[in-house]
Amino acid sequence: MAEVTVKQLAADVGAPVDRLLKQIVEAGLKARSENDAVTSDEKQQLLAYLRKNHGEAEAEPRKITLKRKTTTTLKAGKAKTVNVEVRKRRTYIKRAELQPEPEAEAPAPEEPVQAPAAEQAPVEEAPKVAAEAAPAEAPETEAPAAAETEAKAAPEPAAESAEPAIAPEDIPMPPPEDEGRDRKPKKKKEKVRERGDDIEEGKPKKKQAGHRGPRSRPVEEPVVLSEDEEETTLRKPLRAKKKPKEKRHAFERPTKPMVREVQIPETITVGDLAQRMAVKSADVIKTLMGMGVMATINQALDQETAILVTEELGHKPKAVSEDAFEEEVLSEITGPDEGKEKIKRAPVVSVMGHVDHGKTSLLDHIRRAKVAAGESGGITQHIGAYHVETEHGMVSFLDTPGHAAFTAMRARGAQCTDIVILVVAADDGVMPQTKEAVEHARSAGVPIVVAINKMDKEEADPDRIKNELSALEVIPEDWGGDVQFVPVSAHTGMGIDDLLEAVLLQAEILELEASPDAAAKGVVVESSLERGRGSVATVLVQNGTLRQGDMVVAGSFFGKVRAMTDEAGRQVKEAGPSIPVEILGLNGTPDAGDEFFAVADEKKAKELAEFRQTREREQRLQRQQAAKLENMFENMGKDEVKTLNVVLKTDVRGSLEAITKALQDLGNDEVQVKIVSSGVGGIAETDVSLAMATNAVIFGFNVRADTASKRLVEQEGLDLRYYSIIYNLIDDVKAALTGMLKPEFREDIVGIADVRDVFRSPKFGQVAGCMVTEGTVYRNKPIRVLRDNVVIFEGELESLRRFKDDVAEVRNGMECGIGVKGYDVKVGDQIEVFDRVRVERQLESTGA
């Protein structure tokens, strides 16, 4: 140790210099001044003298008593409190420092045996003096076997001897984990835990505490306790506890934000988007509000909006097409068709043309049937599917409606056919639906065969038809084109065979093939809901063979084929390519034009159908929400739009679609049609109840209400109407909307009178003497006062007199006295009498 002066040593130990010089002399050292140096050996000699002089080596262990008083308040009621004072006293006894002699005398072989006792003896001493002890004393208790420890620890007792008053300051406050040690039941456990903490490093940590603690008690030296603690400590047997592990969560909070790749379909609800990003829905809604979009948790978002929200929240969006999932499922449930033998199949022919041009009558002659007579009003309102065995081969026909409302139906007919027969009346020429049929066929890429019908009439002019169609780029073969024109007569049967030959010739050019061994695949032509049969779908098989018992997916519906019938109503077990059949067993009525296919896995079929239903519902909700947002600001400040609520029930799905489209096209900015419910099948009580709740009109197209529904309609006084012709339904709705329009009034001038003089009457006040110059002046009609041909007042007549008599009217060329109510007229003014005439408005709509 480096030498220090007496003055420095006195400052270190905190004693006066004179006293320290006196103690140096008493210790037998050479006398010196305060600036003389003191060596390390002299320090040790001085320390030994001081210890001996103060009797520290032989004295009893030094005691330290700690007292603690805590005061708390307990509430014994609303207004009563009790003060509780807890007083605690602890006495810690520190034994003399361990001497190095016993350790030096102890033989080496005995070290493993004595190690537990030697190690645990200081453990007993440490809790009494500094179990929660000062860091300066920790090396003292942990290294009793080292001789050099005595030299290191020597200055500390010297300081303690010099100033014993600072001894209590060496004991720090307990660490946080032992704050509850002052509770009596825990005292013994704390001692065991302290003993376990000082086990040498070479032993495993499991031996620090636990049930092995009590086994080492016989080896321990007795623990000296104060009288206050002795009784409480020995009250219960010692039972050690495992040292509690550090209380930490197993999950550690990530230091960096989690960035996820979020798959976003075409439509997704706010709740689903929040779940995929692992954030709260409120955060997504808040972000949307910041972007100017007001949304709820169940509202559907489009893909672009969802991508913006995802990027705003710090995640990576990935746009996903819903068709990918559908195609994946389709590839799983429909096997590949490669390698299966293909055979020639019959052509599917769609008969199209303008209304009343003879399409159905032409088919009747081909099928030797009378279908047209069965159609209401003599017009076709459904797609009919038939297959005909002719001398030249089998042909499947689709008869489409010609009315303007059935545009979508005709488009579907063109999409699922191979050849289009365009029927044009020779006496009528090309009409709007004829042009539309040409456009449908051209957009579908289907060849056309023109049938010029009604050739038996005298006014038939086939050349005119050719000229008009050539303007639509339908060029006949004899004019150098590629379209066959066949003159026919559905009435006499002229040219029918030629027409079939032309169709089959066109089919040979197309080389139509199909594989009968593949899984059935085709298109839904029509669907309906029939009492006793359930959902009935007319399907056209385009490839494969459909058998009874097959699992079928059609649009968003699925089911097992329980029965199949042909167009004549005969039961069939299977249907090959190009054969139309009616199937029973679907769980709903699919839309006309939906694709159907037979599958082997019922689970996958159900999964695909439910996926399509969910997608349709989300798209519908999204359209409704978009319409609300678009019209929100447009409708602000405007009068409320009047709506005609309609409950619509039809016999087949195609008619439902056509009527719905036609009704939605009606209306304008003032009145609109709102279809609150629509469906296929008869009118049930639920439909009537809905009409009651929404104050709606019930329309039945080729369907009827049951007895209970009729009774409810009569009781509630609802409006129930049946229709079989689409014209009549649309006309009635148009008339109802017209009646809902605000009336317009036209002002007609009925008479003009010039003011010639003004005089005052005691009874009427100011009276104008007038001459009627035009028309007739009536007493009870509104008037205007004109001055210099400018209207300055508008009001009513207070009185109209001729001479002294009150009159109802004064004709042209006669004088009269006119009292104007609330206004003073002057000479030269004109009094104009007019009448307001109500003008009935007509509904202008694009769908009419």
Swiss-Prot record:
It is found in: Cytoplasm. Residues 378-382 are annotated as: G2. Keywords: Cytoplasm, GTP-binding, Initiation factor, Nucleotide-binding, Protein biosynthesis. Residues 90-253 are annotated as: Disordered. Residues 399-402 are annotated as: G3. GO terms for molecular function: GTP binding; GTPase activity; translation initiation factor activity. Residues 344-511 form the tr-type G domain. It comes from the Bacteria. Pfam families: EF-G_D2, GTP_EFTU, IF-2, IF2_assoc, IF2_N. Residues 105-170 have a biased composition (Low complexity). Residues 204-215, 236-248 have a biased composition (Basic residues). Residues 453-456 are annotated as: G4. GTP binds at residues 353-360, 399-403, 453-456. Residues 489-491 are annotated as: G5. Residues 353-360 are annotated as: G1. Gene3D superfamilies: P-loop containing nucleotide triphosphate hydrolases, Putative DNA-binding domain, N-terminal subdomain of bacterial translation initiation factor IF2, Translation factors, Translation initiation factor IF- 2, domain 3. Belongs to the TRAFAC class translation factor GTPase superfamily. Classic translation factor GTPase family. IF-2 subfamily. HAMAP family: IF_2_B. One of the essential components for the initiation of protein synthesis. Protects formylmethionyl-tRNA from spontaneous hydrolysis and promotes its binding to the 30S ribosomal subunits. Also involved in the hydrolysis of GTP during the formation of the 70S ribosomal complex. This is Translation initiation factor IF-2.
